[in-house]
Amino acid sequence: SIDLLLQRGDDDFSFSIPGLSRYRVSTYKQRGSLAAVIRVITFELPKPDELGIPDTVVQLSDYTKGLVLVTGPAGSGKSTTLACLVDRINSTKSDHIITLEDPLEFLHRHKKSIVSQREISIDTENYLVALRAALRQSPDVILLGEMRDYETIQTAMTAAETGHLVLSSLHTIGAANTISRIIDVFEPNQQRQIAVQLSMVLKAVVSQQLIPDTNGRMIPAFEIMVMTPAISNMIRDNKVHQIDGIIYTSAKEDMISMDNSLLGLYKAGRITSETALRYCTNPEMMRKKL
């Protein structure tokens, strides 16, 4: 990591101090000196309810195949949510779970499952190489830390299509934006085929952001989209822009828009109206509901 830092001017890595904690570090050069941002990662993964992760999100780990995406801006808790999904599978199923991460964050002990954790640039060259290799390593579940390019996305969808559960993340906000982003990565002459494939393998998109509560602590707000025949048809027919409306008006307990999630937190007295307006996607509609 030091060699990479000196060579490139920045690097990400993680390390542990026994008996204390784990740390994720982003180091970089600035004005001729070195700087670092360090985040604490506990050895023991907190329970989902302690983190404010809804049961609907945790239960996405019940899928045995397909693609589940957790999205949101940097530092919004995506890795923690994915780690909770992995931990639930590890605790309840006899599976082989392969995680591909850059860097490794939470360390998973073998419980009912076997968990193989591979760190990019240390245990393997890159995400694409590791993902292709994982398909030959008899996985039931693959955690792909990030889908960074079209080849990795294509391979991840193929893995999901061939009977594996693939969990991954993107730096997008909202289910419709996430789906559009995936399709737009590909060349125009491939987008129709990719949309059809995505409509078949995608199981759910969870978008999250951390927002301040009335006590000044950061709590998560979630948008949850689970695949339905209507949404599948919208993806296939290039009507992705209509998905937000389906989520917003959904009466299903396992589907909620970001704005309705924020409204629920406001009505519960957990956030202020100013916070709800700041983080919502439709301020005009939110003002009316507040």
Provide a role label for each language-model segment.
Residues 1-290:
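Short, flexible helix-loop junctions that flank or precede catalytic/ligand sites
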